[in-house]
């Protein structure tokens, strides 16, 4: 019953974040300017970004390219090559398929959330942060540290939004500087 309530709240959280629109001050986002909407899918946008090659390989290995080419919308908090390398886990090969999928689900939330949406939700939350449920059924907490947006997973793993987001036809790619799952 508790799980049903949690899933019932997920669309409400998405709508509360998505309702922010583009009204928030984009200057608040630091170096994360919003790029123009693209006709590319999330999978193509990730594939075109040079610093997300490792993530693209994890997506292929997990067999989730089709999901990120589908309807969506989703927001992918995309760890850069250096972040995935620092995690120290090789997620290639058939034996790592389940781990690859689990890692990806921990970095994807339903809905298309721009940096402005996230900043506006944090501001409405009074600076105490705002939470969003991932596709892995974990909670991510978004807060500000100075001008940076920090994401904290339930297990304590943290990452910051970095670089420019990419608005794709079926969601948003938000680059992050860390992995949102602690190494087991």
Language-model features, listed with the residues they occupy:
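Mature, structured domains of secreted/extracytosolic soluble proteins
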Residues: 2-7, 15, 20-184
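Contiguous ligand/interfacial binding patches
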Residues: 12
């Amino acid at each position: 019953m508790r799980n049903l309530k949690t899933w019932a709240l997920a669309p409400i959280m998405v709508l509360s974040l998505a309702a922010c629109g583009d009204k928030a001050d984009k200057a608040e986002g630091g170096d994360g300017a919003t790029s123009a909407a693209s006709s590319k899918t999330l999978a193509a946008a990730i594939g075109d970004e040079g610093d997300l090659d490792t993530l693209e390989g994890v997506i292929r290995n997990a067999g989730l390219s089709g999901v990120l080419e589908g309807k969506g919308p989703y927001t992918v908090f995309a760890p850069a090559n250096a972040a995935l390398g620092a995690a120290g886990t090789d997620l290639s090969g058939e034996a790592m398929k389940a781990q690859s999928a689990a890692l990806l689900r921990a970095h994807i939330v339903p809905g298309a959330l721009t940096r402005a949406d996230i900043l506006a939700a944090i501001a409405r939350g009074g600076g105490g942060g705002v939470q969003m449920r991932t596709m892995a059924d974990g909670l991510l907490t978004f807060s500000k540290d100075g001008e940076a947006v920090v994401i904290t997973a339930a297990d304590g793993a943290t990452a910051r939004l970095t670089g420019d987001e990419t608005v794709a036809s079926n969601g948003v790619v938000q680059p992050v500087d860390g992995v949102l799952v602690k190494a087991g």
